[in-house]
Amino acid sequence: MTEETTGGQYCVKGLVQQVLVGLERGVTVVIDHTEHDGPVLVAATMTLEPQAGGDHELALPPQRIVEQVKIRTNGKAWTPGEIAEDVLPDLVKAVRADDGIPTRFRLVTDGALNCDTLLTFAARLKAMPVAEDPLLALDDRNSRAFRYGRWLSERGYFQALMHRAGAKDAGRFWRMLAGFEAEGLVHAAHLEARIDAVLAEVVDAHEDVVGKRHELVGRMAKLAAAGGSISAIALLGEAGLPAD
């Protein structure tokens, strides 16, 4: 007979997943130069459990990435309504005053996604400037633009999501949605494999890869407990790993 997973075990699993996601982002930015290069690498800063919202943040000179990491306990795919209620409230807290730095607000989950409508809407907002009155800028004539339990206009869909998320500031909510992305079916084993593949490029011996990953996970967990920030290069340096 299989024992049911307890709430405490889910809590630990969620913390481990959060740390692994943050670590994978950090080591990839520094060691894998396919996406980022030059001085960007030096300035990459990671923050776990930032006070402003999200589970972790990666700050780079050209952009900021805020991610909310969620494990799925019921086996069901994430719907727009569930994302609006369980994910977006924390992400909208991370919206800053318009400082000109593009920000990606991401859901990362081990569950499946069933939120194409939400992602399509987010892409539409991204292509539009934030209006002085966001609600008036959204179309309200086509009453069958988006399906959310029932058919809604573009404006109605925005208002429904905003209400579900408990958001009060339409401008802040728009900026968050315009940068929203979702990545599903991200499992711990996949993250560990990605981290190990990157670490294998800089460790002295291949058999040291897993040990170094465990060391980095421990350091990241301490960082999360303190809500602190560290440059990705400094984190690797503390573990005796070169970043170039």
Regions from the PLM with identified roles:
Residues 1-13, 69-244:
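Acidic metal-coordinating catalytic centers involved in nucleic-acid phosphodiester chemistry
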Residues 11-12, 18-86:
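Catalytic centers of nucleases
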